[in-house]
């Protein structure tokens, strides 16, 4: 019978880079960083978590284009806690650090290349993180700003009754906060549909009851449209 004990890797590596060091391409040469990068694909969530912490603590996540790319691939990680940490790391890498310094251009360019091509699965993963950890909203908005087509995926979520009420609400909110103006017509149609059904329900009390999702989301749709239409 196989043992149930899970091997937890140990990464021994001091912080690789100080704030004054912006050279990239050397982080991958350090054994601890390389081992941690490989463990990002480990099927055991706790191992992936330790690997991610190592890459952040050594500074490699902000310095190495390869490491930043590998971290970005975990945006669809099934573990919500780990995915939330990925969002925080990536969002922070796209902003100045405590000293006001940006990550190397090679890192931001690599992230822009990957994040600009996000699909529904990654976008949905970001919305789930927002529901789970609302305090990560700035990082999520920063990431979505890079993906010009994310608005299309978000409006699909907002329209889908298969999604939970909170997912739909957060999708609508993100559309307004990032500023996806192309989503205005779809939101207007959603508003008209909701208002028409509400009016019909009020004039015909014998009609089937309105879904709670639609009635509850109408204020969110109106608020989003107000923000998107403002100068």
PLM segments and residue spans:
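Amphipathic alpha-helical scaffolding segments comprising HEAT/armadillo-like alpha-solenoid repeats
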Residues: 27-39, 61-76, 95-128, 147-159, ...
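Eukaryotic acidic, Ser/Thr-rich intrinsically disordered low-complexity regions
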Residues: 199-231
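N-terminal "cap/leader" segments of large eukaryotic alpha-helical scaffolds
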Residues: 2-42
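Short inter-helical turns and helix N-cap capping residues of alpha-solenoid HEAT/ARM repeat scaffolds
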Residues: 43-44, 78-79, 119, 133, ...
């Amino acid at each position: 019978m196989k043992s149930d004990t899970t091997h937890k890797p140990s990464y021994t590596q001091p912080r690789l880079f100080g704030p004054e060091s912006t050279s990239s391409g050397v982080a991958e040469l350090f054994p601890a960083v390389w081992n941690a990068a490989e463990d990002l694909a480990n099927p055991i969530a706790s191992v992936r978590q330790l690997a991610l912490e190592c890459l952040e603590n050594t500074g490699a996540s902000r310095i190495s284009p390869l490491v930043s790319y590998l971290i970005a691939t975990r945006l669809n990680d099934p573990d919500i806690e780990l995915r939330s940490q990925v969002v925080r790391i990536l969002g922070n890498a796209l902003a100045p650090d405590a000293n006001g310094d940006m990550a190397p251009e090679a890192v931001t360019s690599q992230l822009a290349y990957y994040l600009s091509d996000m699909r529904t699965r990654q976008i949905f993963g970001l919305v789930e993180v927002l529901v789970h950890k609302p305090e990560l909203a700035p990082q999520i908005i920063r990431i979505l700003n890079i993906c010009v087509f994310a608005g299309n995926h978000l409006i699909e979520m907002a329209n889908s009754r298969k999604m939970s009420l909170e997912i739909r609400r957060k999708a609508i909110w993100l559309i307004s906060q990032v500023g996806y103006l192309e989503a205005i017509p779809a939101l207007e149609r959603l508003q008209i549909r909701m208002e028409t059904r509400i009016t019909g329900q009020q004039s015909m009390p014998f009609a089937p009851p309105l879904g709670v999702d639609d009635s509850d989301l109408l204020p969110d749709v109106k608020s989003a449209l107000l923000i998107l239409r403002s100068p």
